[in-house]
Amino acid sequence: MDWTINIQLLFTGLAMGSIYALIALGIVLIYRAADIVNFAQGELVMLPAFVAVFMLNSWELPAYVVYPLVIVFMGGVGYVFERVAYYPLRNRSFLPVIISTIGVSIFLKNSAQYAFGALPLVMPRPTDVDLFVIGDIVIDPQYIIIIVTTAILLVAQHFFFERTMLGKMMQATAQDKEAAQLMGIPIARMIAITFIFSTMLACVAGLLVGPLFYVSKEMGGMAGLKGFCGAIIGGF
């Protein structure tokens, strides 16, 4: 195989792997904090892509305005998700909460179809550069954006959990809820913040992958499945 094709495949693999890593990270965060598997994580990737397409096309706002607004909006969605799907069932067994997240997944998918239609949509790219051409190597600039953004987020997350008080409180909650509560850590608040954080990670994944493919109500299903596989391989 030509070495130029190998390089192009490398960038493609790194970019898509970065997307699945963000999804997997969100799944793992909720699992460790709340002891549940969030089967709606894929739909939390799909929803912000639809919202961004609507704002970019209908409101004609630039991407640097739309993306932060969508991330904040999805943070609110994450909080509502925790209050509705998890909090009332927090003292129940594992199964009802799992079914609740599946219900949220179905609700979000059908809501997206009702609000934005059944046909796939095209998300405008954040840059005007179509392709990077270096000799015989052709690279989609969106791949570079995905890889760089994911790397920055992973470094920022490491700093957040290791250097900030809130991050350490979230870690303590994930490791031992009873001990964290005895130390005065508000574990209910930490779990809610974890849901918000996880949803915002899914949002970033949706905004990054949206320009590469058509935005449809089905896009979250496969992405969520691959992210779930990544979480299993990486270890919950």
What residue ranges belong to the model's regions?
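Short, non-helical or kinked segments that cap or interrupt transmembrane helices
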Residues: 29-49, 63, 91-96, 166-169, ...
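Transmembrane helix-bundle core of multi-pass membrane transporters
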Residues: 88-163, 190
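Alpha-helical transmembrane segments within multi-pass membrane transporters and channels
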Residues: 60-104, 111
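Single transmembrane alpha-helix segments in multi-pass membrane proteins
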Residues: 5-56, 80-91, 96, 235-236
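Helix-loop-helix "hairpin" substructures at the membrane interface of multi-pass membrane proteins
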Residues: 16, 138-216, 220
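Membrane-interfacial amphipathic/re-entrant helices at transmembrane-helix boundaries
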Residues: 1-23, 51, 61-66, 92-99, ...
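Alpha-helical transmembrane segments of polytopic integral membrane proteins
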Residues: 24-33, 52, 77-78, 82-83, ...
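Transmembrane alpha-helical segments in multi-pass inner-membrane proteins
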Residues: 20, 24, 60-72, 195-202, ...
